[in-house]
């Protein structure tokens, strides 16, 4: 039998972060009960030398935590088993590091951006996967790292209003200026005619460009230090639930990017609202934290594109991220039930029991107020309001994968206000498999 290898562990190599099941992090920051996952011949006692900083520790809801200070060769693919996921070596294999966003880490991240590399960073919505938005080759690395189709446009992120004008081909309208004053910095993206400075692959060949001014201080500082607009979709593998914690990013992008800035959990929890400003009336292409009613109150009117709650038609091009493909999806099959709560609960119980009898591993996603309707069946909480659902939805979908669920049954909410953003994300995760009860 092959003997597990032992390593010398110089301090110089102790800057990498790795995922550990939450049960293996002691309250004092050490590591315990790791023998099932670590094949180092010292067992758990050897692992206990590496400590998690509780001030910087990012907990993955119900699943794992990021352990800072562990040397990567100790936690190699040979000696450490990552539960619930696999990592494929290949062209993307990089030494992915996770750092707290202090000034030194931000300067290093900005240098990587300027050098055409990729950095994951927190925003108030979700974590973004950033590259120099004026460098077509750097932008192409985003598509490659994510496995993202080339016809799915990106958003440029700026850190000042002055940075907008060079990116767009015309002066913003008075309506756009009012919306900037009301919602920037914040979770609103606006689409304008694209200037010649913006590479075509940022906009997937469209003659428009999507621009956002985020409010998260880490995002703002990174953009300012980089000195360029940062092109950034969500920092996950294409089709997966968007990341709202650094642990989610590491789960999807480990080995594919060089650096993750860990700014803690995101506040909003769903991506920004995307509004097309090229017509007479602001048109919502992707709902988010800024609602249609809020936009109408500032702009005088707003309209919601029909594709928000349906797949694109054959030959229809996506004008915004999140319009064309199945997004945000867990590994299991997801079905959404809409209707009166007790009737919905009855249908979900019936579907759950049928899946269980078929040998599947079902899971129910429900509002807190309805949990009692499901008895002792497995239920993941969606929160107690549409706002709470928006904040926790992507983490819940990732938890479903951690639990090994292969048949998911979710309650719906009414598609208005923030509920429209929730139903848009749930709908795309379920390929719009919505059952009316």
Regions found by a protein language model. Name each.
Residues 32, 45-46, 58, 65, ...:
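Serine residues within intrinsically disordered or low-complexity segments
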Residues 5:
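Pore-lining transmembrane helices
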Residues 59, 66-68, 73, 81-90:
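Short, positively charged and aromatic/hydrophobic N-terminal segments
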Residues 67, 78, 88-437:
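Active-site-adjacent structural elements in enzyme catalytic cores
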Residues 8, 18, 23-29, 37-43, ...:
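Asp/Glu-rich intrinsically disordered low-complexity tracts
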């Amino acid at each position: 039998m092959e003997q597990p290898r032992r390593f010398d562990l110089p301090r110089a190599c102790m800057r990498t972060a790795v995922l550990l099941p939450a049960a293996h992090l002691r309250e004092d920051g050490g590591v315990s009960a790791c023998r099932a996952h670590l094949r180092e011949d010292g067992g758990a006692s050897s692992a206990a030398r590496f400590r998690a900083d509780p001030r910087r520790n990012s907990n993955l809801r119900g699943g794992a935590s990021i352990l800072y200070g562990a040397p990567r060769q100790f936690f190699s693919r040979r000696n450490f088993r990552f539960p619930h996921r696999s990592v494929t070596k290949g062209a993307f294999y990089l030494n992915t590091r996770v750092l707290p966003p202090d000034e030194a880490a931000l300067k290093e991240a900005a240098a990587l951006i300027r050098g055409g590399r990729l950095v994951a960073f927190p925003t108030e919505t979700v974590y973004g996967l950033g590259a120099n938005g004026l460098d077509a080759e750097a932008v192409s690395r985003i598509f490659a790292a994510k496995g993202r189709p080339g016809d799915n446009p990106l958003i440029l992120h700026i850190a000042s209003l002055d940075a907008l004008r060079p990116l767009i081909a015309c002066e913003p309208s008075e309506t756009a200026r009012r919306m900037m004053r009301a919602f920037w910095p914040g979770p609103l993206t606006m689409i304008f005619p694209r200037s010649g400075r913006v590479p075509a692959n940022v906009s997937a060949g469209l003659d428009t460009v999507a621009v956002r001014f985020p409010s998260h201080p880490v995002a703002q500082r990174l953009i300012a230090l980089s000195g360029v607009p940062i092109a950034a979709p969500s920092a996950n593998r294409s089709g997966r639930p968007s990341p709202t914690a650094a642990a989610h990013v590491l789960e999807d992008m480990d080995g594919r990017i060089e650096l993750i800035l860990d700014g803690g959990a995101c506040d909003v929890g769903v991506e920004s609202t995307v509004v097309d400003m090229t017509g007479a009336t602001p048109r919502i292409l992707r709902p988010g934290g800024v609602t249609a009613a809020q936009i109408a109150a500032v702009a005088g009117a707003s309209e919601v594109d029909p594709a928000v709650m349906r797949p694109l038609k054959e030959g229809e091009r996506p004008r915004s991220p999140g319009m064309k493909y199945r997004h945000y999806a867990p590994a299991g099959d997801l079905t959404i039930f809409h209707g009166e709560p007790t009737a919905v609960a009855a249908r979900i119980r019936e579907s759950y029991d049928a899946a269980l009898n078929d040998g599947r591993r079902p899971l129910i996603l429900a509002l807190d107020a309805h949990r009692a309707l499901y008895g002792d069946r497995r239920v993941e909480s969606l929160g107690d309001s549409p706002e709470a659902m928006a904040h926790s939805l992507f983490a819940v979908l990732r938890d479903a994968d951690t639990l090994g669920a292969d048949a998911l049954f979710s309650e719906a909410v009414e598609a208005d206000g923030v509920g429209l953003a929730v139903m848009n994300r749930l709908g795309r995760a379920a390929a719009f498999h919505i059952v009316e009860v």
